[in-house]
From Swiss-Prot:
Its cofactor is Mg(2+). This is Inorganic pyrophosphatase. Catalyzes the hydrolysis of inorganic pyrophosphate (PPi) forming two phosphate ions. The gene is ppa. CDD domains: pyrophosphatase (cd00412). It is found in: Cytoplasm. Keywords: Cytoplasm, Hydrolase, Magnesium, Metal-binding.
């Protein structure tokens, strides 16, 4: 099943579709979904014995400054299957830099039609402090044992920054 036809969202940038690549709390394996075939490929076994604190995926038809689609973290009560698509609402963004340049991670919560559990989270300040600390900790350390790779977390930004990241990346992909 090709994922090329999955739209970026229902109403950008407030209502997005996230293609999940890595389930929350899963084994330390980095998966990537092939957009043409829909197949889930093993990208690598992570050297650091860590797991993603949230489901991890991307917004289709977007192009971030690192040359990949917009990365998105989706907290949910249960891990999501790789290759699944979930309707979400962005609430913040973790600004980062790695060996390839800028590498922002949008945080988006499930749309209220999927779960009412996240309706109170409207902006980055509403995300539980422990979850933000876990996300920051993960990204500061998940590449530590990989030669030539590094990450610098630059900090958290609000919902407007997350929406801007999505819109700019969507426009970049359309103009490519």
């Amino acid at each position: 099943m090709s994922l090329n036809h999955v739209p970026a969202g229902k109403s950008l940038p407030e209502d997005i579709y996230v293609v999940i690549e890595i389930p929350a709390n899963a084994d330390p394996i980095k998966y990537e979904v092939d957009k043409d075939s829909g197949a889930v490929f093993v990208d690598r076994f992570m050297s650091a014995p860590m797991f993603y604190p949230c489901n991890y995926g991307y917004v289709n038809n977007t192009l971030s400054l690192d040359g990949d689609p917009v990365d998105v973290l989706v907290p949910t009560p249960y891990p999501l299957m790789p290759g699944s698509v979930i309707r979400c609402r962005p609430v913040g963004v973790l600004k980062m830099t790695d060996e390839s340049g800028e590498d922002a991670k949008v945080v988006a919560v499930p749309h209220s039609k999927i779960s009412k559990e996240y309706e109170h989270i409207q902006d980055v300040g509403d995300i539980p402090e422990l979850l933000k600390a876990q996300i920051t900790h993960f990204f500061e350390r998940y590449k530590e044992l990989e030669s030539g790779k590094w990450v610098k977390v630059d900090g958290w930004a609000d919902v407007e920054a997350a929406k801007a990241e999505i819109l700019q990346s969507y426009e970049r992909a359309q103009n490519k």
